[in-house]
């Protein structure tokens, strides 16, 4: 048991240094789909297991609960890395700044370790229009920069931004984004985007590293996981870590939280190439309606 705990704890000790010198734990807990009234218990369970990086968003509707969990988990605030996201619809400076302040009030926290723009387009426009909201993203980014300078945020970043979106933002940004949180998993590995971010010293974060569960239905992936003596979710999470990304598996189940951190193995270079080029899954099942999975609102 002691050896097991040591190996899991080692995983939680792994961190990446952002371009402003701030350290971010490489494995975090995603909280999408965790109800607000269950979020505090989920955060406390995760922290007890060893997680120190908690990721939420205005769109998740659980910031209050996540904040409660952070405040009552028994771990000093400065030992946790807490992230939220500016709503995708906030495309003016005023909306974004009001949202940042509202998040801090809702979570009852003095600062966030990071806040990011959730999407370059409002969700109702994703996969439906060509407009990349260049000026709106620049305005929202200015709000993040100002909140960062004021000490409300320790780091700032973006999510779901494509190369063209990042390039447009960099033209006027005073502060470079520290992360780009994207859909990244076996069967969806946009290497051009990943390499562009890495070249620009922007850390990639992987949300839905287990493809919202749909990767569990791929027999070839199950075979590779068995070869390493691990579960498919463990293989998927390890894959994103070996790409140099931060991994954010989402779950409210403490057993899954534990299992997701048992990553004391290494995928061979040969298998990494195979997984990078694995065929695209045809569907995200019932979750395919969400814009991040190609759906339309």
Show which residues each predicted segment covers.
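Active-site mouth loops of central-metabolism enzymes
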Residues: 27-37, 86-93, 128-130
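Acidic (Asp/Glu)-rich catalytic clusters
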Residues: 19, 67-77, 104-108, 170-173, ...
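N-terminal binding-site loop/beta-alpha segment at the start of enzyme catalytic domains
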Residues: 2-80, 211, 284, 291, ...
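Beta/alpha (TIM)-barrel catalytic core signal, keyed to glycine-rich beta->alpha loops juxtaposed to Asp/Glu
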Residues: 88, 122-297
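A short, structured active-site edge motif that brings together acidic residues
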Residues: 77-90, 111-120, 184
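CE4/NodB-like, metal-dependent polysaccharide N-deacetylase domain
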Residues: 96-116, 146-150
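Residues at the N-termini of beta-strands
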Residues: 53, 111-114, 155, 179
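Short, acidic/polar
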Residues: 35-46, 92-107, 164-166, 188-189
């Amino acid at each position: 048991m002691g050896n097991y705990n040591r190996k899991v704890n080692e995983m939680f000790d792994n961190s990446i240094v952002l371009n402003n010198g701030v350290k971010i734990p490489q494995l975090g807990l995603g909280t999408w789909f965790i109800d607000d009234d269950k979020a505090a218990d989920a955060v406390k369970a995760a922290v007890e297991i060893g997680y120190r990086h908690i990721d939420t968003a205005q769109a998740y509707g659980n910031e209050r609960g996540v904040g409660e969990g952070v405040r009552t988990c028994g771990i000093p605030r400065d030992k946790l890395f807490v992230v939220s996201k500016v709503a995708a619809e906030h495309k003016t400076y005023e909306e974004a700044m009001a949202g940042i302040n509202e998040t801090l009030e809702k979570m009852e926290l003095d600062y966030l370790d990071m806040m990011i723009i959730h999407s370059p387009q409002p969700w109702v426009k994703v996969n439906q229009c060509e407009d990349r909201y260049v000026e709106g993203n620049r305005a929202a980014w200015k709000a993040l920069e100002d909140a960062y300078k004021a000490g409300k945020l320790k780091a700032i970043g973006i999510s779901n931004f494509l190369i063209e979106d990042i390039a447009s933002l960099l033209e006027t940004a005073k502060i470079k984004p520290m992360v780009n949180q994207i859909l990244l998993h076996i069967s969806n590995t946009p290497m051009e985007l990943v390499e562009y971010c890495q070249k620009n010293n922007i850390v990639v974060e992987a949300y839905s590293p287990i493809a919202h569960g749909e990767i569990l239905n791929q027999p070839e992936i199950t075979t590779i996981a068995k070869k390493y003596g691990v579960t498919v979710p463990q293989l998927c999470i390890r894959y994103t870590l070996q790409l140099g990304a931060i991994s954010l598996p989402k779950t409210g189940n403490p057993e899954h939280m534990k299992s997701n951190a048992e990553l004391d193995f290494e995928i061979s270079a040969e298998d990494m190439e195979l997984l990078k080029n694995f065929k695209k899954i045809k569907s995200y099942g019932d979750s395919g309606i969400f814009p991040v999975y190609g759906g339309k609102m």
